[in-house]
Amino acid sequence: MIEKEKFERHLRGTNLSENTISSYMFAIKQYGEQYDDITQKKLREYKVWLIENYKPKTVNLRLRAINCYLECIGKEKWKLPFVRVQQKSFLENVISEADYEYFKSCLKRDDETFWYFVIRFLAATGARVSELIQIKAEHVKLGHLDLYSKGGKLRRIYIPKELQNEALSWLAEKQQESGFIFLNKYGDRITTRGISGQLKKLAVRYDINPAVVYPHSFRHRFAKNFLERCNDIAFLADLMGHESIETTRIYLRKTATEQREIVDTIVDW
């Protein structure tokens, strides 16, 4: 028997985000639709089914959920090994610095101040969009935001001085002294989905490739720019909130466009 309620209580006793909890519960529900109990044989069959039907990253996400469930019910020895994900030799769909600067100038020109600060904060702090919407006026005044990661580790998101001064002026114009700074038209905190959808619309308006305009793209831009100006990957890993420096190493790679430009410049034979 699959103990879904027990698992959900277990998850809610951790520091996992709501999105992660939902994802893990979905995986257990999916397993439960095929099998009515947990055995090593059925776990292996489920893994084979996942591999046949999903991409490696999704397979590993499901396996991570299953392994967490196995911990919950005291069956750690049955944990399933992850499948190997073939890493690409380049970063995909990262907004270029030129497009980022162009995007900022367009938003400023058209008085799209709210969206100007959305992309400014994402690209200048390296915040995830789920972290961005937690920023308050108090954090802007302070110059940083402290958050706790999934493992309970403290992460500080710094707001650079130039951005801080700009944002303080914006808040003063709005006469906002406290509270969340990124609100929707109803005065509620904007959702991550709301940000993603509007960024795509703005990309189309300004003739920027929509494939490179999404919240995490600006976090990638932050990491790329940081490494180009300060080649300290350990420091960047801390700023990004990465558990392992290996995760941060991807930013040492060039984008596909950068690779093409280098090859076109160098290869003349």
Please provide the spans of the model-predicted regions.
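Conserved catalytic core of the tyrosine transesterase superfamily
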Residues: M1-W269
